[in-house]
């Protein structure tokens, strides 16, 4: 009899607490995963299309001394992809934050709104600055990028980790803190932003015909 009462109490406690909703689950939802994969594919297709056929002269050309060349933008994207993925992994090493929903619940929409918007310009942090290294060719940058992106996409497609519960800070205090999912999402949104920059370079007066 005592055992039966104990079982009933356990069941009642479970019913009182209720099932874990999708909003409470720190893992990626199916919609979040599909959105991330779509952004990753879109950003890669855009970049490869923009770089297709770019000559060495076009790769190195600058509209002004203080403006980035296409090559510099592409190297910045390569550096940033590695950094942002590493930040996601760094976040996963931190203890799960019980207040992750409060601290990061609105940040995904903020990233989607702010990052592709080129009307607000920001200076790249020093660790992500591509200046001073013009040795990588277009082919080398693309090969390295494809390797990194394959890793990022495989992770996005297969991980079951509770990404949203693990937080850390990055190089832009405006967004801090972000959770691990948001750092991975940052990768393609940041690329979409700079794909626009590459298109702007190609549309600038004086851009070499070949």
What are these regions (language model features)?
Residues 5-16:
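Bacterial N-terminal signal peptides
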Residues 42-52, 82-83, 119-123, 150, ...:
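Generic structural signal for well-ordered, non-membrane alpha-helices
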Residues 31-79:
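N-terminal secretory signal peptides
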Residues 1-2:
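N-terminal secretory signal peptides that target proteins for export/translocation
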